């Protein structure tokens, strides 16, 4: 059966729409570009081009995976974040646009003489690499508990030719020496309650639960980082963490309980509480 690019896109968009995809046009285009190994502009320039039988078979196989709910990023193996192409795998969370807000907040709070940033739970390396790409004189360290994630992040650094970042394996601060002090510590840790019904919906069904779910109503890892972060921050340094849209008020309270000052919450692009930060200052 011969199909043009235009006809194949139209048919697949209809199928994706019926299955409830919230971005059927984008999904279909990304999958077809991946199969054809062509940029998006190619689909617009050559809509009448006939797709080969082999290409059609490959496309239909990927489309079936998407129709079953598998995230596009896992199907094609990459996701763009902060304009950086990043390889992803089912061992890591898929980088999301909302997390770019954490990168923006970190960059906004860097002083001219800042030297080091620590990213905890780095996953694909998205946050660490985004910051490192903007500030090539900074030393950036990313930490993840999963060996596979650390190797993936290292690969993403090579792909993007970013040399001022280092990735280490370990649980939170475990691979960091107490003699190491940072201007800023950032993290997008697990913060979802295990009973949250959203865990059975959408892309998160396919993502590693260990990177999503935390005890104490989703606060356990946030609190752990807050407690121990004080030991690794320079005087006047900032801790900033991404969290759920309903956790901002409680998290500000926890920050203040732990002695941080200038505590505030920043909103994401949809106006929801997304990043809470506090400054650690020691009186001499």
UniProtKB/Swiss-Prot annotation:
Keywords assigned: Methyltransferase, S-adenosyl-L-methionine, Transferase
Q: What EC number(s) is this enzyme filed under?
A: 2.1.1.297
CDD domains linked to this entry = AdoMet_MTases
Show the disulfide pairing: none
InterPro entries with a match to the protein in the record: DNA_methylase_N6_adenine_CS, HemK-like, Methyltranfer_dom, N5-glutamine_MTase, PrmC_N, RF_methyltr_PrmC, SAM-dependent_MTases_sf
Q: Which GO terms describe its biological process?
A: methylation
Q: Could you state a single Gene Ontology molecular function term? A: nucleic acid binding
Which family would the database say this protein is a member of?
Belongs to the protein N5-glutamine methyltransferase family. PrmC subfamily.
The record's annotation in NCBIfam families points to: hemK_fam (TIGR00536), RF_mod_PrmC (TIGR03534)
Tell me the protein's name. Answer: Release factor glutamine methyltransferase
Give the source species: Aliivibrio fischeri (strain ATCC 700601 / ES114)
């Amino acid at each position: 059966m011969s199909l043009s690019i235009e006809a194949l896109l139209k048919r697949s968009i209809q199928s994706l729409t019926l299955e409830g995809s919230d971005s059927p046009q984008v999904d279909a285009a990304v999958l077809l570009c991946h199969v054809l190994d062509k940029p998006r502009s190619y689909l617009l320039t050559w809509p009448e081009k006939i797709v080969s039988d082999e290409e059609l078979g490959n496309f239909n196989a990927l489309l079936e995976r998407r129709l079953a709910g598998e995230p596009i990023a896992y199907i094609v193996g990459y996701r763009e974040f902060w304009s950086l192409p990043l390889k992803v795998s089912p061992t890591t969370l898929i980088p999301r646009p909302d997390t770019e807000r954490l990168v923006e907040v970190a960059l906004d709070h860097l002083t001219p003489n800042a030297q080091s940033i620590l990213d905890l739970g780095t996953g694909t390396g998205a946050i660490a690499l985004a910051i490192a790409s903007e500030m090539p004189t900074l030393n950036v360290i990313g930490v993840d508990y999963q060996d596979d994630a650390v190797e993936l992040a290292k690969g993403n650094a090579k792909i993007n030719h970013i040399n001022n970042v280092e990735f280490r394996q370990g649980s939170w601060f475990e691979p960091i020496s107490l003699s190491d002090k940072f201007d800023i510590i950032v993290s997008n840790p697990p913060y979802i309650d295990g009973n949250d019904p959203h865990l059975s919906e959408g892309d998160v069904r396919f993502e590693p639960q260990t990177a999503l779910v935390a005890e104490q109503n989703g606060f356990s890892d946030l609190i752990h980082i807050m407690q121990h972060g004080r030991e690794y921050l320079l005087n006047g340094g900032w801790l900033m963490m991404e969290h759920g849209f309903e956790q901002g008020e409680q998290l500000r309270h926890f920050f203040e309980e732990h002695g941080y000052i200038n505590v505030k919450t920043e909103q994401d692009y949809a106006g929801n509480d997304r990043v809470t930060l506090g400054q650690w200052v020691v009186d001499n």
